[in-house]
Curated annotation (Swiss-Prot):
Ribonucleoprotein as UniProt keyword: no
Phylogenetic classification of the source organism: Bacteria, Bacillati, Chloroflexota, Chloroflexia, Chloroflexales
GO biological process, one term: tetrahydrobiopterin biosynthetic process
Keyword annotations from UniProtKB, A to Z: Lyase
GO MF annotation terms: 4-alpha-hydroxytetrahydrobiopterin dehydratase activity
Protein name: Putative pterin-4-alpha-carbinolamine dehydratase
Organism from which the protein derives: Roseiflexus sp. (strain RS-1)
Length: 93
């Protein structure tokens, strides 16, 4: 099981990400895409990253907006896995 991060570690790692915010025990970001099909294509790419990492975000799709939420359920909060996947997601955007 991944080790849960402290509040200080979470804030430090959030400083390395753009647009991700902490919402309790998760980090969240909303992506604005040019069209609904491009939003779906983005989600498919995120799905492949998530599957490869063995770590899956909660996904909310609203027309051209995709909101991703990351947390490590078995650790009961945020772990390095969440920040690693957030970084990978940002790299494909």
């Amino acid at each position: 099981m991944a080790t849960r991060l402290s509040d200080a570690e979470i804030e430090e790692r959030l400083g390395d990400l753009t647009g991700w915010t902490r919402q309790g025990n998760e980090i969240r970001k909303t992506f604005q895409l040019p069209s609904f099909p491009s939003a779906i294509a983005f989600v498919v790419n995120v799905a492949f990253l998530a599957e490869a990492a063995g770590h899956h975000p909660d996904i909310d799709i609203r027309w051209r907006k995709v909101t991703l939420s990351l947390t490590t359920h078995d650790a009961g909060g945020l772990t390095q896995k969440d920040f690693d996947l957030a970084t990978q997601i940002d790299e494909i955007m």
